[in-house]
Structures are given as structure tokens and as C-alpha cells.
């Protein structure tokens, strides 16, 4: 199973790093922004932002942000495990 330590971060702009990982139909994007020590993630389905229950903290609110900020590597690991389980057992 892919975990945070297996992500391949690429510098997409000065000091801006991004890694992508596919889980079935969903693509996870993990970003480290310049000057930050925590990560943010977003999920995509066919290049469109998606929100998933159990991953997005405010999923049931009328409006919640597609991007989940201020994540530690262990938080990203937990999200990756959930995505893997959704994909592997679908």
C-alpha cells in the first residue's frame, strides 16, 4: 500500500512541491507550499475537485473547502489508507 513516505514530490514552482497518487477513480494531490511545514491535500475525479465523507471534515455542511490544509505526514497516511480501502474493496 502506498504511504506518505512513498510519494514523489516534484517542485512545480519555486518552493512549491506537489505529489500525486491515484486510488481507483480518485487522484490525491498533496502539496507543500513555500514556507510551510504542513501539507494540504485535494481529491480529484476526472480533473474535478471532489469531497468524500470520512475524509473531508465538513462534508455534510452546505459549503466546505475542497482543500484540506494543515496536515502532518501521519494525517496524509490516514487519508491514503482510507482511499486505498475504498478502492481495494469497492
Residue locations for each model-derived region?
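Mixed-charge, Lys/Arg-enriched low-complexity segments
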Residues: 1-3, 10, 44-90
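Conserved small-residue motifs centered on glycine
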Residues: 41
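Negatively charged, low-complexity tracts enriched in Asp/Glu with abundant Ser/Thr
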Residues: 1-38, 62-66
Amino acid at each position: 500500500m502506498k504511504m506518505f513516505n512513498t510519494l514523489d514530490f516534484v517542485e512545480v514552482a519555486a518552493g512549491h512541491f506537489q505529489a500525486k497518487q491515484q486510488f481507483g477513480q480518485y487522484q490525491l494531490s498533496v502539496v507543500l507550499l513555500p514556507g510551510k511545514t504542513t501539507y494540504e491535500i485535494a481529491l480529484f475525479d476526472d480533473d474535478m475537485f471532489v469531497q468524500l465523507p470520512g475524509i473531508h471534515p465538513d462534508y455534510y455542511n452546505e459549503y466546505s473547502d475542497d482543500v484540506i490544509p494543515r496536515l502532518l505526514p501521519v494525517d496524509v497516511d490516514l487519508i491514503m489508507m482510507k482511499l486505498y480501502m475504498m478502492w481495494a474493496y469497492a
